[in-house]
Amino acid sequence: MFRRLILDALEDRYNAQISEAEATLKIYLEKPVAIGEHPQHVDEADRLIEKISTAEEKLRTLQAFKL
């Protein structure tokens, strides 16, 4: 029971990280004026893509424990 709760919580966490990074990246790409305080747009986009990739990799790894 606790095993399932922990695994589900981790899955929710990683999915939330992906959603947050995707939403922020979309704003950066579609409304760059809204982020004037971030002059390093390419670096920030790269950081968000890294965050998405990391969370997706964690989700794939997590699937091995859900079997």
Annotate each PLM feature.
Residues 2-67:
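Extended, charge-rich alpha-helical interface modules
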